[in-house]
């Protein structure tokens, strides 16, 4: 089976796919562009909903010193691991922005938050915290650029890791018969559902679960067609 990944994969994930017999092509359909930011004030509670924001913030000399000793609230297991690897305290990790916003609104009523994010993002954090009058400072530190490419070769499956990658893919491509999509999470799946019903979603937004989703489809669902 031939798979197309819409981003460059980790060496471990790529090796595991190849070991299972998949032929793999990687092409990044989005590019992350840092936005120069002058950060003056950072609250004691910090929100991250993407790995890109974490990596950029931790590697930016103007930002990184201001992040020491804070409480962190994040979306995604990998985001949590990056923060903890750098010695930061993660108070709460949720699987998506809606769950995290709900947790904060119920448990941190009188607290203030700083949200490091991209220009293109889900609205839940801002919407829910505003409804509960929770003070929130936004720090937009990157933008997501589309890098679409027309794919001429035939693939059996396409791996998607963000709604932005879905949008970029369909700027230059259509969904061909017989193809199946594999989504890292529900927000990505919601974007793909506008173009096809042929997709699977990882039970949790991580590489292990995505690999299980791919394996299950091709050993059960696909085999029964």
Regions found by a protein language model. Name each.
Residues 1-225:
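Signature of uroporphyrinogen-III synthase
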């Amino acid at each position: 089976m031939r798979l197309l990944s819409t981003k460059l994969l980790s060496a471990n994930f790529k090796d595991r796919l190849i070991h299972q017999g998949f032929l793999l092509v990687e092409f990044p359909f989005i590019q992350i562009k840092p936005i120069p930011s002058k950060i003056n004030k950072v609250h004691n509670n910090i929100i991250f909903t993407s790995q890109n924001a974490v990596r950029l913030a931790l590697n930016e000399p103007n930002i990184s010193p201001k992040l020491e000793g804070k409480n962190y609230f994040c979306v995604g297991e990998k985001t949590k691991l990056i923060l903890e690897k750098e010695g930061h305290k993660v108070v709460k990790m949720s699987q998506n922005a809606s769950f995290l916003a709900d947790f904060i609104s119920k448990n941190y009523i009188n607290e203030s938050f700083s949200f490091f994010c991209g220009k293109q993002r889900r609205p839940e954090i801002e919407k829910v915290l505003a409804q509960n009058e929770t003070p929130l400072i936004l720090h937009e530190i990157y933008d997501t650029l589309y890098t679409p490419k027309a794919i001429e070769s035939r693939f059996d499956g396409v791996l998607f890791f963000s709604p932005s990658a879905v949008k970029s893919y369909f700027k230059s491509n259509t969904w061909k018969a017989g193809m199946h999509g594999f989504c890292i999470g529900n927000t990505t799946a919601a974007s793909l559902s506008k173009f096809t019903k042929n997709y699977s979603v990882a039970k949790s937004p991580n590489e292990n679960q995505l690999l299980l989703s791919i394996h299950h489809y091709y050993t059960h669902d696909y085999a029964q067609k």
